[in-house]
Amino acid sequence: DNRLVGSEMCIRDRTCIAPDHLVVPPALRSPLLKAMEEARTEMYGSDPLNSNQLGQIINERQFNRLEQLLESARADGRILIGGEISREQRRIAPTVIRVDDRNDPLMAEELFGPLLPVLVLDDLTTALQEIRQGPKPLALYLFGGDEAQQQQVLTTTSSGGVCLNDVVMQAGVPQLPFGGVGASGMGSYHGQSGFDTFSHHKAVLKRPFRFDFKLRYPPYQVDLNLLKRLAG
């Protein structure tokens, strides 16, 4: 899919809201991989390492980290698409890798590189359980689904933001707050939300001298019924 290959793999090493992994049901695994491979060829050609559309990994340290993850997956026969790598060019072609559970090293950190782990789960309910078992994500993406399924995702998960049928685009809408929840951060900014977050809301109370509550001071003669009425 163009939105996954283009919008995700092109900027995966430069944004904190690129998908960390992809969850698909068994029936969609093969057609999705076929579509992603076609999109990759369309964008980067048959020799992606020499494409002028493919950027470099930012430095050698990050390249070494990604190379180690990639070669470990290659040794296990888990590369589904891509896997091309050039140390001289400091480039890694967009690569899709099979993972079998959340304990895989590829699922343990933000990759910041063109490696996309794919996890096959039976259905949406199982996928939502998997999401809830991990830290609350900064961004959550859902492709497809009817209105009921979309509402199920929105109401049973907690994340900084959600984008339906696309990735990353929510960060470009200034009217939408951007921020995390829990492990992914607290608070939000952009537009009015940014003004509120970075402003101090000072509380001010002014009371007149001519009226006071004598119940505040000793000797206390508390009428519980009166207090209950005052408390509503």
Predicted regions: what they are:
Residues D1, L70-E71, F195:
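Short glycine-/small-residue-rich flexible loop motifs, especially phosphate/cofactor-binding loops
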Residues D1-G6, I11:
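Single conserved hydrophobic/aromatic residue that forms the stacking wall/gate
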Residues E8, R40-Y44, K202:
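Short, well-ordered alpha-helical segments in soluble proteins
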Residues T15-C16:
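Extended low-complexity, polyampholyte segments enriched in Ser/Thr/Pro and acidic residues
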Residues D20:
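Glycine/small-residue-rich pyrophosphate-binding loop that anchors the diphosphate of NDP-sugar donors
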Residues P26-K136, L142:
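NAD(P)-dependent aldehyde/semialdehyde dehydrogenase
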Residues R91-G232:
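Conserved C-terminal structural/oligomerization subdomain of aldehyde/semialdehyde dehydrogenase
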